Amino acid sequence: MINRITDNKFELVSKYKPSGDQPQAIEQLVDNIEGGEKAQILMGATGTGKTYTMSQVIAQVNKPTLVIAHNKTLAGQLYGEFKEFFPNNAVEYFVSYYDYYQPEAYVPSSDTYIEKDSSVNDEIDKLRHSATSALLERNDVIVVASVSCIYGLGSPKEYSDSVVSLRPGLEISRDKLLNDLVDIQFERNDIDFQRGKFRVRGDVVEIFPASRDEHAFRVEFFGDEIDRIREVEALTGRVLGEVDHLAIFPATHFVTNEDHMEVAIAKIQAELEEQLAIFEKEGKLLEAQRLKQRTEYDIEMLREMGYTNGVENYSRHMDGRSEGEPPYTLLDFFPDDFLIMIDESHMTMGQIRGMYNGDRSRKEMLVNYGFRLPSALDNRPLRREEFESHVHQIVYVSATPGDYENEQTDTVIEQIIRPTGLLDPEVEVRPTMGQIDDLLGEINARVEKNERTFITTLTKKMAEDLTDYFKEMGVKVKYMHSDIKTLERTEIIRDLRLGVFDVLVGINLLREGIDVPEVSLVAILDADKEGFLRNERGLIQTIGRAARNSEGHVIMYADTMTQSMQRAIDETARRRAIQMAYNEEHGIVPQTIKKEIRDLISVTKAALPDKEETVEIESLNKQERKDMIKKLEGQMQEAAGLLDFELAAQIRDMILEIKAMD
């Protein structure tokens, strides 16, 4: 067990001072948290600096904080921002560590068993270990996570009880330390020294913690006593300094001591016998044979190695949980009095609520056909009510909070004023009769001013037809559909910003990364057709795409005024009036956001330095593609090291697309 530091303070470092309505929002949020309010909503318009407000709140309430985003890209962006705001505190990143993941599944109609197949990202695995160890060591911790934080993880008690604590003067033999390291899943490797491994040279043991990627620790013995402990560069062996205490956390989150392992194995065997009897009674002899063979192999691995592939499927027995009891997750590593912030809560809460059912149906198939014991069903994400039971205090952050959040609390704190003075755009409704020619005139007016246009349609066919028509009319236009891959999408957005074309047509323009300050017109076709992208929230989010330009304008083409349209228009007008009054009072003139246009194509050029210009990937031979992947992987690691996770994710997607060609 380790002693957790509880008196560290968050130190916010920023050249900015709260402005606009940020000071009031920060004060209200902090007062409510300190007053014991369980749930509240920060309803912040796009571009109002919600992350900065969140940072101010974290610094002032000084609680360990979990920030949940609805995908890895957004989590990476938030992680980078919080790292800049809190350079002297522990800002951690916890997302799924799979670059590629095919879950274990069975399709009875074709008698197809799909074995679990995955590619683990070593960098993300390191960051996950860094997050859990930081939570057990100190109180000034921010963990930015995706929804994977509600999936099963090992017991925090077993994890912390398994920590190997070392200090100079400690009486412990070298061999005892080696055995202790093996017990917590470290591997001995005297040649290939990497994370989660140790090596031995006489009376010196070098240990590479699972939460580090460059620094290791050298433990020097004098007889059966630790003489000194040094931190060293893993690659060069250069000594960085001496340490007074070293806590070595397990190399895996699923760790169990020997006594608990024997109890767990006995329970697994008992469950196996019970399930085999059920299968035999039902005449399912093939299923019984399959289950017996697989489970006995896993038991043997657990007995000999303390680990097996798919060990998480036995986590109920290893944790000592009852049937149906929720698994341990990242949330259990936090102290009781912690703060949760849900970014883009209208999206994220839907994911949190929906994870359990999808996981359950897949695993039931595996159990019914003898691929897993029934206890595998308890290796799962949390149900909604189980997640709620972990909530001590929570802040939902969104421009358009969902029904769920509004049901949880009546406390809504608004943040509407943008530091740039930008206003929510003007919105007008025009009839559908002659809408295409009307829109063509609006596009041409924007082209003359070197501004861009977004057009959102409801169907793929309409988007394609519209694109073809505008091309015939001489408009430089592109259509962005759902089949376009991440990297290609990024290139399209870049070309739009550079003026390679002037109009982007799409169905869903609410994906991350589609914020283009050059867009001054957003046209919404079929605005009166109620649905996911034409409900109040969808319309407000779409309208927000024109809020980065001082000339922002939105035209809805519709023949009737739906309630969703009216509410979206009214809300936008309300915000705009507040923003205009603030600007007038403070003499602020709205300025279009100046955003750097990153040249992603240079990534390809850098990966192929012997080429004079960027080439089509399809034209490369297998060896050239292999060389490109190797160089791109280096650039991806470099981007991650610089905390530019958005670029790192884009390079990763490019690598996956190139690999898919082989």
From Swiss-Prot:
Record-annotated Helicase ATP-binding domain positions: 31-188
Motif Beta-hairpin per record, residues: 97-120
Start and end residues of each UVR domain: 626-661
Domain of life: Bacteria
Keywords of the record: ATP-binding, Cytoplasm, DNA damage, DNA excision, DNA repair, Excision nuclease, Helicase, Hydrolase, Nucleotide-binding, SOS response
Helicase C-terminal domain sequence ranges: 435-601
Entry's Gene Ontology molecular function annotations: ATP binding; ATP hydrolysis activity; DNA binding; excinuclease ABC activity; helicase activity
Positions that bind ATP: 44-51
Domain notes: The beta-hairpin motif is involved in DNA binding.
Quaternary data: Forms a heterotetramer with UvrA during the search for lesions. Interacts with UvrC in an incision complex.
Family per record: Belongs to the UvrB family.
Protein's UniProt name: UvrABC system protein B
Annotated source species: Streptococcus sanguinis (strain SK36)
Gene this chain is encoded by: uvrB
